[in-house]
Amino acid sequence: MYAVFQSGGKQHRVSEGQTLRLEKLEAETGANVEFDCVLLVANGEEVTVGAPFVTGGKVTAEVVTHGRGDKIKVVKFRRRKHSRKQMGHRQWFTEVKITGISA
C-alpha cells in the first residue's frame, strides 16, 4: 500500500515504515503529525485518485528529528568589474517516519 501526499509545496510517494525528509514542520521530536492533503492511495490493484484530494485520506507520521541539509554555495559573479558575491545556504528539514495510511 502506498500514497502520494502534498507537504511543503512538494509531492511525496510513501509507504508504511518509510522515512523521508520534508520541509521543516513546527512539531516536537517524537510527536505524531497528520497529512490530509492526500492525492492518491493505492492498495494492491485498487487505486483511488482524488480530485484534487482523496476524501477521508490521511497519512500519519512520527517526527524523528530536525536538522539542516548540506551547504549549497551561491556565487554571483560580475564580469570585468572585479566584483563577486559568494553566499552559502543550509535548508532546514524535518525527518519523519510514516506510521499509517488510510483512505
Curated annotation (Swiss-Prot):
Keyword RNA-binding on entry: yes
Sequence similarity: Belongs to the bacterial ribosomal protein bL21 family.
Keywords per UniProt: Ribonucleoprotein, Ribosomal protein, RNA-binding, rRNA-binding
Entry protein name: Large ribosomal subunit protein bL21
GO CC annotation, single: cytoplasm
GO biological process entries: translation
Species, as recorded: Photobacterium profundum (strain SS9)
Record function comment: This protein binds to 23S rRNA in the presence of protein L20.
Ribonucleoprotein found in the keyword field: yes
The organism's place on the tree of life at top rank: Bacteria
Taxonomic path: Bacteria, Pseudomonadati, Pseudomonadota, Gammaproteobacteria, Vibrionales
Assembly behavior: Part of the 50S ribosomal subunit. Contacts protein L20.
NCBIfam families tied to this protein: L21
Coiled coil: none
Transmembrane segments: none
GO molecular function: rRNA binding; structural constituent of ribosome
